């Protein structure tokens, strides 16, 4: 078995947008569950009104404006956590790119993009669908974007195994 070392930590979660905020919130027993704000839940058919949404996230702290526009929110969260982890590690620019790998866990990938583009198709027609539709939503794009950003040439993959995703990624 090969040795793997986790040298930095980053987090974007319903209780904090950094590892430090997340840890402090967990220690304090803070819940990240609250009313859904990401979409309208007023339809009587929508029985779920609560969720653990990420709050007050600003992707511009981690990505260029053009890259934000071409990426789904799940990928922006992954990039933010990766940037934080790299900063925490102190290794950025000081590591052999062949030894730097990226593993990202995503339960489903870019669902926001999928829903948005389906609505665009229905309301505006086929010609209005974004050329970035597929690259934005596929689950492995987050790992790919992170690998590109940090010039990682080691293993790069996305693990998509539902509730076991985080354990498999580690």
Feature-to-residue mapping (PLM):
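Conserved "HGTGT" condensation-loop signature of ketosynthase/thiolase-family condensing enzymes
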Residues: 1-108, 113-155
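Short conserved active-site loop signatures built around small residues
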Residues: 166
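Short loop-beta-helix segment that forms the pyridoxal 5′-phosphate
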Residues: 155-161
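Active-site histidine-anchored catalytic micro-motif
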Residues: 169
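Pocket-edge positions in alpha/beta enzyme catalytic cores
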Residues: 70, 161-162
